[in-house]
Each structure stands twice: as C-alpha cells, then as structure tokens.
Amino acid sequence: EIHFLKLHPSLVREIHLRQVNQMAVRSLVGGCANTQARVIAVGVESGDEWKMLRHLGVHAGQGPWFADPEPLNLPD
C-alpha cells in the first residue's frame, strides 16, 4: 500500500508555465484519487508553482517557498 507519492523537483519546477508537467501531475493525482496516498510536491520554489500544484490537487509540498533547509542535528 502506498501512503505518499512525492513529485520530483524537475516535475515541479515552473509547473505554472509547463503544460506537459501539469498534465503529468494531474494524471498522477488522478491515479491516487481512490487511494489513501497523499501527493507531495518536492522543491517548491515559488507561490506560482504552489498555486498551480494546489489547483492540480497536490496535497502538500516542501521546498524553499515554505522554509529554508536547516541542518540536521544528530545527538552525540
């Protein structure tokens, strides 16, 4: 069973300008429609990208648009 489907940053980059990428994401989101899977966009860099991704049905996102990466602090 698939719980999460993460979209590669190359698919997300400038998606608001790329119709082929929009069709691919729409298809992937549609394929997950009757499942428990949540679609997550990785590498979201702008509000325009995020707006389009939400319009296409993407559930969540991560990337510089939301927060800058932080270093991983491991216990000693």
Model-found features: residue ranges?
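EAL-family c-di-GMP phosphodiesterase catalytic domain
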Residues: 1-76
